[in-house]
Amino acid sequence: MGKPQTHQHAVDTNVSHSPARWVDGEISEGQLPDKRLDRRLRQVFDQMGGAMGQSIPRACKDWANTKAAYRFFSNDRVSDHAILKGHFVATRERVTSASGPILILQDTTEFSYQRERPEQIGYTKSVNSGKDDTGRWRHHTVCGLLMHSSLAVTISGVPLGLTALKLWTRDKFKGTAALKRKINPTRVPIETKESYRWLENLRQSNELIADPGRCVHSDIYELFSLAAELGTNFLVRAQNNRLACGGTHTVTTELADQPVCAAQVIEVRHDKGAVMPVTLDVKFRTIHVLPPIGKQKTYKPLMLSYIHAVERDEPTDRPRVDWKLVTNLPVHTAAEAIEKLSWYALRWKIEVFHKILKSGCRAEDVKLRTADRLTKLLAVFCILCWRVFWITMSSRDGTAAAEVDLTGIEIKILDRVVPDKPSCPADARNLAFYAIKLAKLGGYLNRKSDPPPGNIVMWRGLNRLTDIALGISIAAELVGN
């Protein structure tokens, strides 16, 4: 096979990949029960990753590959956990290589689907659909899946990967609203609640990372107690005004007596998209917190640090910023309180991850008919979306090498297709450098006034890079023949 030599950035089609494909770093050998399934999983990643947001038939391009993908997702020997197993291992390696505290962000999201037979998938909620002729509210159930995910990020906001993932549906709605009015939810055993998944993900994340002291998790008292048992840390936004001291006070009354110790300026985005700075008055206090009354025989009181940050001036066009955070980390100074506020501000990263799933992969547009098949496809989407998010954030961090996520042929393609600036130093060719080139393929202009590239231009660039690589591969075969 001939090698073009006419340009300093000519693409060498014989360059070996390092790794062979990016996905090889996210798939463990033998993680599926059959080598053929391992090969098919890699092929599914290549196909879906090269056509993010497209349907399975369009990504697979022909009936044979489409049918093979359908069979893979229908295979009883394949599970969503098996698909994610290699990614969990890779996440652990990235966490080990990173320095400083690791934030484990947890959140739940919904995926809704329109199906002729919704019972094959399940339901997420019951909603009002207007009134009938007699004026009574009509209810209908929404077909879909729920996903609770845990994402490891550095304190600079770089996503290192998923540490735990749970997918499920709901099957009981009738009478639940009336039941909530009759019982005290704090007296119900946590094991019977959906919120138990927060504890399950906390435990799985700590087992995976194997260094719980570095982890900070994102207002369940059982989570507080489990964190103490596992020797890990948490930082959450408090939702409940818990009993404090001997039960004669609450957390709110304890904080009310504290003076403001610092001011912190943050940026707030309006509904219309405009960003403006606001000043928060910050105070903190370490408080002896009691468990809920119905669970005081099961759980012990805890010494927790509360941080209250409230917007100094009452706005007229939006709700006032009012954060009340609770953590088992020590908070003795104003600087430590502000540090925890900056950590909590990173919580939106997991919301961005879920947005990539729905907007980039268009996870709610897929046509698979059963929950079992959908969960496996969503597991694939999660890894693809993490990669987009990882490259996007790496474009703002100049420490990672390009070979960490891009293959040799991909690097050469970017060098050939996206010209360098004359002043570009040779030693600056890291992942951040090539991420900008990748974003340019997706339409990013890289002007001085432009913000850093976002996820949309990044996945467009990845799709285009895949098409260019395919064209080069076909051209090389034609020349060779």
Predicted feature locations:
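Single, function-defining residue in the core of a domain
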Residues: 2-132, 141-146, 151-481
